[in-house]
Amino acid sequence: MEKYFAPSELIINEDGSCFHLHLKPEQLADRVILVGDPARVNTVANHFDSIECEVSSREFHTITGTYQGKRITCQSHGIGCDNIDIVMTELDSLANIDYQTRTEKKEHRTLTCVRIGTCGGLQPYTPTGTFIASVKSIGFDGLLNYYGGRNDVCDIKLEEAFKQHMHWDPIKGAPYVAIADEQLIEQIAQDDMVRGYTISCGGFYGPQGRKIRIPLADPDQNEKVEAFEYDSLRICNFEMESSALAGLASLLRHRAMTCCMVIANRYAQEMNTAYKNTIDTLIVKVLDRI
């Protein structure tokens, strides 16, 4: 029996678009570039040879076009894993649910999703300007723990090793380790990118060890994170979305990964706010390789 998705669960707008993104099924390409900043969608689309459509709703800005013969959708997601939950669920629904019958399509359509973002470097070999590809992402946000099958797509041994190393306080909720698509990593992350682990935090300040006016629950968090090593790789960076992206993509049978440019190095306490021109280099690399 076909699974029917009720209007209260899968919300479809009157114009036939998905609830938050306001995107219609025919407007979605198989290749998707994800960016946090809605304005960065235009930066990506400036490289397109042609523009097919443009849609904006709240922080979700979409442009679909072509680049060197490849049809690509560039989608902004805003900040945080909670927004990735919205974006990935709705993109998957556009690809794999018939909006007319509200039932799952018989043939699965696989999306290839690459997030281009900014991050904070955590190692001496990740100074500002470094491009980092997230091989595995440790989610501090807890989002994937709400979905069935999370253990099937996560690195449980790495999770346990990390919790033991950190003396993890269970009051924070269990971290999860999501795995990027290995073939996509090989395709995108070439010699000009550092491969490593990433931590996706549930916030920008306290969760990333920034003490402004409120004391930190674990003042030694970042030092412990920087020292962690597993299977010859270290945690290279902090950001706020890659774990949810990799985890949800795995559960939904899509291909996904994140590559970020370091704009702050927490180890060296350096920051580069004038990064917008430099990130264009990373954008072109991803466009060429996706």
Task: State what each model feature region is.
Residues 1-176:
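Metabolite-binding pocket within alpha/beta catalytic cores that recognizes anionic/polar moieties
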Residues 20-27, 202-208, 280-289:
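Intrinsically disordered, low-complexity segments enriched in small residues
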Residues 120, 137, 199-206, 244, ...:
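Glycine-rich beta-alpha junction loops
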Residues 157-230:
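Active-site rim beta-loop-alpha module in soluble metabolic enzymes
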Residues 175-180, 237-244:
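Polyanion-binding loop/helix "lid" in catalytic or ligand-binding cores
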Residues 232-236:
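Short pre-catalytic strand/loop immediately N-terminal to key active-site residues, enriched for Gly-Thr
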Residues 239-259:
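Short glycine-rich, acidic/polar surface loops and turns
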Residues 265-290:
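His/Asp/Glu-rich mid-to-C-terminal helical/loop segments that flank catalytic regions of hydrolases
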